[in-house]
C-alpha cells in the first residue's frame, strides 16, 4: 500500500463509534494483505481493469492498518479505526501530543490545546473522497476534532505534513492536492461498511 493511500486513510478520522465489522483480527489483516498483493501483481503486469470491483471491508482495512502496518503509522498516531459510509470516510485514532511538543516549528492553532492537554488523546476526522479523473483522487475534510475539541483544517494540514515528512517525501503529504490512486486503480467507491476498488 502506498504512503499516499495510508496517509489518506489515516487522515480521515471521525467521532462516530466504529461499526461492528471494524473488529481487528489477524485473519482480516491477512485477507487485506492478499488483496493488496493481487492488486499490485495486476498493476505490474499491466492487466486491464477488473470486471468486478474488489471489495475491502472496514474490518480488513482496520486489521491491516493496526496489525500489519502499525509500525509504519505516522509519528505519534495509533489505534486507527476507519469507517466507510456512502461517499464518506471516517476514522478515529489516538495522537500522542507529547510527540508534538518540542517541534522545531510549532503547529499554529494547536498551541492553546497543547497548553492543557498531554499524552494520548483521540483525534477524529470525517471527509469525502472524490475521484477527480480516472485514477486520480482528492480529499476534503468536513470535520476534525482533537480530544473532542473542533480544530481548524489548517491545524490538520500541519499535523499531516509533520507526520508524513520523510527522506522520500521531504515536504510531507498535502491533503488538498489531488493524488494518483495506487495499483493503477481507476476509482474507489465508498459504501456503508466497505470500499469498492476498480
Report residues per predicted region.
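Extracellular/lumenal and peripheral-membrane lipid-interaction modules
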Residues: 15-198
Amino acid at each position: 500500500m502506498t504512503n499516499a493511500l495510508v496517509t489518506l486513510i489515516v487522515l480521515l478520522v471521525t467521532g462516530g463509534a466504529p461499526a461492528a465489522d471494524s473488529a481487528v483480527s489477524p485473519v482480516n489483516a491477512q485477507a487485506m494483505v492478499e488483496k493488496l498483493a493481487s492488486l499490485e501483481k495486476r498493476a505490474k503486469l499491466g492487466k486491464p481493469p477488473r470486471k468486478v470491483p474488489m471489495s475491502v471491508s472496514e474490518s480488513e482495512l482496520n486489521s491491516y492498518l493496526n496489525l500489519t502496518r502499525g509500525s509504519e503509522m505516522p509519528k505519534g498516531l495509533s489505534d486507527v479505526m476507519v469507517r466507510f459510509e456512502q461517499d464518506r470516510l471516517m476514522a478515529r485514532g489516538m495522537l500522542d501530543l507529547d510527540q508534538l511538543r518540542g517541534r522545531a516549528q510549532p503547529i499554529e492553532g494547536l498551541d492553546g490545546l497543547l497548553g492543557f492537554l498531554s499524552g494520548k488523546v483521540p483525534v477524529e476526522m470525517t471527509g469525502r473522497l472524490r475521484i477527480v479523473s480516472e485514477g486520480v483522487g482528492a480529499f476534503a475534510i468536513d470535520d476534525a476534532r482533537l480530544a473532542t475539541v473542533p480544530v481548524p483544517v489548517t491545524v490538520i494540514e500541519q499535523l499531516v505534513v509533520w507526520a508524513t515528512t520523510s527522506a522520500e517525501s521531504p515536504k510531507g503529504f498535502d491533503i488538498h492536492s489531488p493524488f494518483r490512486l495506487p495499483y493503477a486503480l481507476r476509482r474507489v467507491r465508498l459504501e456503508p461498511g466497505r470500499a469498492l476498488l476498480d
